[in-house]
């Protein structure tokens, strides 16, 4: 179920990128998963295996790879941000027209988006990824290198059951979430509970259990 949900995240994110004029690159791990990703996301994207010993190095190398292909700017996003929208991506590129680095913060103290015009590898190095200080530490590293910073809106990455429950709650108010691949999947997997009042009906309960759990 977790894998299917993450596939929905990827579909939604790729769909939003396709609404922008940007070329799309997918950096994946482990090696050997390219064919599955192509089936999921399409052949029009470009796929590269991730390189590096840790998350920071892999992200830095991905940005360096894309900029090395001759692009003026690169925006890197996480793969667990189903509420990411094309407008946010377009804003990130606009920010890079006047700033060296753009960051998109998450509610838990991390970031879901980072973009730059040159591969500033020091921004990625030595960070405790997965902790609540990543955004602050990355911001400090960029400033220490004398880089100017801009920002996009804060979003929630899907790291826990409470994050998913928050997404479900927002689905009630936002039609675009209900229509997304993630929203449709969550709508099909809503947990239900049934309360059956009984009194001294052991045999009835046993028969009911047999029907529910054959």
Show the residue positions of the predicted features:
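Structured catalytic core of nucleotide-sugar glycosyltransferases
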Residues: 54, 88, 93-95, 188-214
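Short, well-formed alpha-helical segments that are part of the catalytic scaffolds
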Residues: 1-18, 201-214
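Conserved donor-nucleotide/metal-binding helix-loop-beta segment in metal-dependent transferases, i.e.
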Residues: 84-108
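Conserved alpha/beta core of the MobA/IspD/sugar-nucleotide pyrophosphorylase nucleotidyltransferase superfamily
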Residues: 137-189
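Acidic donor-binding segment of Leloir-type glycosyltransferases
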Residues: 23-46, 209-214
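Short phosphate-binding loop-to-helix
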Residues: 39-73
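Short, glycine-/small-residue-rich phosphate/pyrophosphate-handling segment
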Residues: 120-141
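Short aromatic-hydrophobic micro-motifs that form the base-stacking/packing surface
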Residues: 75-77
